[in-house]
Every structure is written in C-alpha cells, then in structure tokens.
Amino acid sequence: MRLGWLRFGLIAAMVALVGIVGVASASRAAEELHLYSLRQEQLIRPLLDAFTKETGIEVKLVSGKDDALLERLKAEGDNSPADVFMTVDAGRLHLAVEAGVLQPIKSETLDKLVPAQYREPSGLWYALSVRARPIMIAKDRVDPSAIKSYLDLADPRWKGKICVRSSGSVYNQSMLDAMIEHYGVEKTEEWAKGLVANFGREPAGGDRDQIKAVAAGECDIALSNSYYLGQLTNSDEESDRAAAAAVTVIWPDQDGFGVHVNVSGAGITKSASNKENAIKLLEFLVSDAAQEIYAGKVYEYPIRDGVPLSPTVEAWGKYKADTLEIAKLGTHNAEAMRIADRAGWR
C-alpha cells in the first residue's frame, strides 16, 4: 500500500511540475512580440529597448528593405510570426491595407494622441512620426525668395539645376500622389515633365546623396526628407556636416496647400498572436518618452503637439503642413507611376 501511495505521489508531483513549466513557458511567450520593420535597426532600436525596459515585453525584431518584408508577410499568411508591421511611408501602409495583412484595433490612447489626419480611419494603422519633404537649396547660389512652391521647380530658369532621386522611391511616388489629389492628373504630369527637364543629372542615390550633390555643386536645388539633413548635420563625418552646412531649407506652398508631409507608422497584423502586447507597443511609441526619441535622435517631427524638437530641427523654422488626409497617400500610386514614366522620370 505504501508503495502505491508513493508511486501516486511521484506521479502527482510530476504532473504538477509539468503544469508549472507549461504556465511559465506560456507566461514567457506572453511577454514578447514580433515586429517586422522597414525602419533601420539603429533608428528603431532605442525605442524598442525603452519599451522593453518599461514593460518587460521583449521585442523580436525582423528588419527588411523596400517591399520585401511586406511580400514575406503576405506569403506567410496566417502562419506569420509577425505581430506588428512597421514601415516608413503612408504609401507602403496603403499597400499593406490593400494586401489585407492588417487588422483594425481599438485603442483609446492611440485615438486620443494620434490626430485623425495621421491614422487609417478604421484603425488599421497609426502614424508614429511625421517627416516633411521640403526643398533644399545651395546657400550661396540660390535666392530663397525665388522659390515659393513645388510648382516653381518646373520653371525653365532652373534647367540643369535640380537633383532628385528616382521615381522608384516611394517618397517621390507619395509626393506625386498628393499632387494628383490637389491638382489633378494633367497638371501633375505637366509639372513632372518640367521637373525632369530641369534635372542636373540622372537620378541616383538616396536623399542624402541629393543634398551632397548640391553641396558639391552638381546642382543647386534638391528634394529631400528633412530628417536626412538632420542626420548629416549631426554626423560623425566632417564631410557630412560640411554638406549639411552648405544647404538651407525652403518650406514651399506656405500660402497654398503647405509642405508635403508623410509619416512612419505601424499596424497590427492579422496573424498577431500577441495582440495585446502589440497594442501596448504602439501606445508606447506615441508616448512622451518615445516621441522625444523620434524628435531628438531621429530628427523627425513628433506625431503630437507639445513634444520638444531637436535643436537641429528647430533651427529650420516652423512650417505649414499639407492637411491632406495621410491615408489617401497611395490611392493614386499606379497613376503616379504612369505620370513619372511618361515624364521620363526614371
């Protein structure tokens, strides 16, 4: 009898131990989430580390480039480990919506802190930071008062003076998208043809390269997202700082629609197995602490008012932003690409 009770006790203890281990494993799994991000890791890592420190939730980061990560998410379907999809342009967020890989969420915190202009109406994604795309000119060769609007860049007086990256850049596609929304297809195409006629060189490189080309005298005017100028200004490389010092920022269309702005943003995937943790991450990324990192270390504009800007960004002055609903960027993408093709903007 004693042997029977002993055997029963051992079995019960083993069952209890397995249960404890299972609960512990489930608990550990619940304290993590998987993030697919098109943002460069060195830019997003400080934010993720701060989130983990505050919440104890570990973020498993998978970084990717261009549209490859979205294609991976689509291919994985319901089996994808991704809980959050983060990207750097409203046009790409629109593609994610069209692909059906995001799910709508409800969050009083996000709805309160993220302006309606900067989120998808049904809650499929929320913007996390704002990036402006102003005109940048050579300080010593261009009179700032000579350019008041993006439309001025098509003026023949600037023939051979403009540098801009390829129309394959989603930043330029979204800008064309916004112009179609404001001006219509015909006027946008006319502008694109005039812009191409003024190119100082074939489009090459990224936005930093356009700024450097102005500094080197290859052209006098460039289009670039503003945070790239912030990165060059604060670079460890003397040549980068010199390039940044050679240009100044023009905020166009201040008497009209305002400067073109875009966003970085994120949404919760349909496959999310850590949905609550994923929502916590998005809520953290619009908190004061996270928004100060976006402003101070990434040189972007906070999604909300009241967050101090980087001194570098503040030095560029205030601007009126385009009030176009950001979720509309991407809706004219196919037409924007056709316009670029007809204009010869490669």
Predicted regions and their residues:
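Early extracytoplasmic/lumenal segment of secretory-pathway proteins
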Residues: 28-95, 346
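Short beta-strand->loop
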Residues: 36-39, 102-111, 121-122, 124-126, 137-139, 145, 151, 238-260, ...
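A structural signal for short loop-to-beta-strand junctions that line the ligand-binding cleft
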Residues: 80-85, 103-135, 151, 161-164
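A bilobed periplasmic-binding-protein/Venus flytrap-type ligand-binding module shared by bacterial periplasmic
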Residues: 134-141, 261-274, 293-294
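Periplasmic-binding protein-like
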Residues: 160-168, 284-308
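Ligand-binding pocket segment of bilobal, Venus flytrap-like solute-binding proteins
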Residues: 174, 178-252
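An extracytoplasmic/periplasmic, membrane-proximal ligand-sensing/linker region
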Residues: 186, 300-346
